[in-house]
Amino acid sequence: KLNNPILIGHSQGCLQILEYAYKYKNKINKAVFIGGSNKMPVHPDLIELAQNGDSEAVKLMMKWGYEGSKKFIGGNPVEKIIKSPRDISEILALDLIACNNYVNGHDAAKSINCPVLFVFGELDKMVNIEAGKKFANLVKDSKTHIIKGCGHMIMIEKAFEMREKVLEFLK
């Protein structure tokens, strides 16, 4: 049994927090949404690429998630995690479909009644700043922090700044 948890999610994980908050009102102590939105539509072509196990799906996501923000020594870490056609078709495709099909985000966000921190990457093309601000405005008790020079993969690109802001909020 969880008693007043603090929930922290990134991207699709934000949708999971939203649904938890909606189903278990008054049970959350605080929440942190990192690079998320109350709705996360996914282009049908990207879903199709992922369903077919095409590595182009991962390349496109990484382009949108990182482009213009940071280059990694040794290559992009996400491409090392999701690398086989099976990973793409059985894991990534299902995640993209779940994001695309989630429709309760607006009502769920409006129902949140605990303090919330929103963290967005200034250069994020997957959840742009405007979508993020609209999301944050749905929540009564919220603070927003935008990390400059950062894309969608905030916890990898700007880990220290993100951690500092989250810890500051949790105190």
Regions found by a protein language model. Name each.
Residues 2-11:
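Alpha/beta-hydrolase fold nucleophile elbow
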Residues 87, 127-130, 157:
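Residue-level signal for the nucleotide or nucleotide-sugar donor/cofactor binding architecture
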Residues 112, 118-120, 124:
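Short beta-strand/loop motif that positions the catalytic acidic residue
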Residues 48-111:
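Conserved alpha/beta-hydrolase catalytic His-Asp/Glu region
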Residues 96, 135, 162, 166, ...:
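Hydrophobic "lid"/C-terminal helical patch
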Residues 129, 133-152:
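Catalytic histidine neighborhood in serine/cysteine hydrolases
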Residues 150-163:
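Catalytic histidine-centered segment of alpha/beta-hydrolase-like enzymes
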Residues 15-59:
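Flexible "cap/lid" loop of the alpha/beta hydrolase fold
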